[in-house]
Amino acid sequence: MLEIRRPSIESFKQLNHFFRIVITDTFNKEGIGDNLEDLEQEIEMKKAYLESDINSNGENRYFLFALEGDIIIGSIEYGPASNLIKTCTNNVLKDLPEVGTVFVHPDYQRNGVGNLLLREIYLTLMKKGIEEFCLDSGYRNAQKIWNKKFGEPDYLLKDFWGEGYDHMIWKVKVKDVF
């Protein structure tokens, strides 16, 4: 049975292992798996985000995880807009929360786990009175998904990560997607 849960100190090690699995898989599927420095940076950033959530009890960052039994199969979080989003939008989106760390374990993809996590984060944002958020992606496979869900990005940074590797940023109204 699928369960959505908040992180705990006890689950920290398991969650970090989950990040390593999904980020490594994402890098490999994107054809950038040999870029080990960026891979490790991405994993460390997610660990830091998770620590921020646990240390602030969800005030600074707010994670949700999907579990099937005792196996973590998905993640999502929201928190302050990243420096990348602030810089690339000339601070236009600096005051919006950013939804991110949307990952589904490779063995559970295309089964609705991501949609369930999105629905839960939309509910959380609504309960907190948050009407819009931003979301960004440099991963081509994820960009296809976000384009279907949110339409064309509000910001398109061509070849931002190298030739053929764009970066996209969306500004989304919760009422438009929920």
What are these regions (language model features)?
Residues 115, 139-157, 163:
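Conserved active-site alpha-helix within GNAT-family acetyltransferase domains
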Residues 104, 110-123, 148:
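Conserved acetyl-CoA-binding loop-helix of GNAT-fold acetyltransferases
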Residues 61, 165-169:
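Short hydrophobic/aromatic beta-strand or adjacent loop that forms the aromatic wall/cage
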Residues 125-138:
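Conserved GNAT acetyl-CoA-binding A-motif
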Residues 14-21, 49, 116, 120:
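Alpha-helical elements of Rossmann-like donor-binding domains used by nucleotide-donor carbohydrate transfer enzymes
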Residues 22, 40-100, 105:
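Acetyl-CoA-dependent GNAT
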Residues 1-34, 176-178:
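Conserved N-terminal entry element of GNAT/NAT acetyltransferase domains
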